[in-house]
Amino acid sequence: MADGLTKSAARNIFYGGSLFFFLLFAALTAHSHWYMVNKSTDNEGLTESVVAGKHIWEKNMCINCHSIMGEGAYFAPELSNVWERYGGHQNPEAARAGLAAWIRAQPLGTQGRRQMPAYDFTDEEMSSLIDFLEWTDGIDDQDWPPHPAG
């Protein structure tokens, strides 16, 4: 009997271990995908307007300055809780009006403040973008961001 591993035993351990961990990786990937699609996505709230708002978010590259749930740039405020910060849970109409007014106003020359570009959104585009921001507020982000101001 050999004192150590033979080449064939080492090869079998390597291939067996590789196959085991590959299958484990594939199973965890499939489960993660299933969980995201069936459990963690608010499919009922995912309306055409929310999808259109996401397309506006992407088309105007908002993520180059803002972040949602920590993903994106940190040049401008976090927006995953902007609906809550504007009081959307208590007064949705006032929150919609406040967000639309803020996005449209963009005061120029404010000392010590970064400037957001002025976007010429139509009323429908603005409504869709706000619907998207409202939808992101409903994502279970496990209390991220920790600071209420984003």
From Swiss-Prot:
The chain crosses the membrane at residues 13-29. Gene3D superfamilies: Cytochrome c-like domain. It is a single-pass membrane protein. Pfam families: Cytochrom_C. Keywords: Cell membrane, Electron transport, Heme, Iron, Membrane, Metal-binding, Respiratory chain, Signal-anchor, Transmembrane, Transmembrane helix, Transport. It is found in: Cell membrane. Its main location: membrane. One of its GO terms (molecular function) is heme binding. GO terms for cellular component: plasma membrane. Disulfide bonds: none annotated. Heme c binds at residues 62, 65-66. Component of the anaerobic respiratory chain that transforms nitrate to dinitrogen (denitrification). Heterodimer of cytochromes b (large subunit) and c (small subunit). This is Nitric oxide reductase subunit C. It comes from Halomonas halodenitrificans.
